[in-house]
């Protein structure tokens, strides 16, 4: 199999890894309520935090990020950078639209960071710093993710990573789509702040 022929395989492998709903798995194992029935209904770390279980939220954040990192590292090792990017796209799509949960997944922030970490780690550091700065000043997790993801493709473009910039422009659009209800709540002043329970 040629390297280009491996791209669809990388996309599928990434999707399958990304579709593992760690937030739902961890909260069920811990005996908490169905994470999809509280807060935003998302299976991601921010919504897990609304259960009041910080350890579960941290575990979800770590495992969701690792989905993206593992996908791109494995695909990149096997078939090079294009396969790594395909796997990253697949992992992101898998997290947002997991087939196991009727295509209703998370918002993609942790996976976004994990993909960045695997493809160009300085951009992951910049993303996290932007997220932290915005979160510190506003206490809105959603706004922090939107700001950081909006700037990330420009950061990659500035440093000459044009293919990565294009990939993350697509991921940013998907992330904004996943946060469409958050954006409406931010505009109306009804968005929950970090640490607030549902």
Swiss-Prot record:
Pathway noted in the entry: Lipid metabolism; phospholipid metabolism
First-listed, main subcellular location of the protein, grouped into a coarse class: membrane
GO cellular component term of the entry, any: plasma membrane
UniProt-recorded Gene Ontology molecular function terms: acyl-phosphate glycerol-3-phosphate acyltransferase activity
Biological process according to GO: phospholipid biosynthetic process
Localization, UniProt: Cell inner membrane
Catalysed reactions, semicolon-separated: an acyl phosphate + sn-glycerol 3-phosphate = a 1-acyl-sn-glycero-3-phosphate + phosphate
Keywords attached to this entry: Cell inner membrane, Cell membrane, Lipid biosynthesis, Lipid metabolism, Membrane, Phospholipid biosynthesis, Phospholipid metabolism, Transferase, Transmembrane, Transmembrane helix
EC number: 2.3.1.275
Source domain of life: Bacteria
Transmembrane stretches, start-end: 6-26, 56-78, 83-101, 113-133, 155-175
Membrane topology label: Multi-pass membrane protein
Assembly and oligomerization: Probably interacts with PlsX.
Protein function: Catalyzes the transfer of an acyl group from acyl-phosphate (acyl-PO(4)) to glycerol-3-phosphate (G3P) to form lysophosphatidic acid (LPA). This enzyme utilizes acyl-phosphate as fatty acyl donor, but not acyl-CoA or acyl-ACP.
Record-stated family: Belongs to the PlsY family.
Protein name in UniProt: Glycerol-3-phosphate acyltransferase
Species in which this protein is naturally found: Bradyrhizobium diazoefficiens (strain JCM 10833 / BCRC 13528 / IAM 13628 / NBRC 14792 / USDA 110)
Gene: plsY
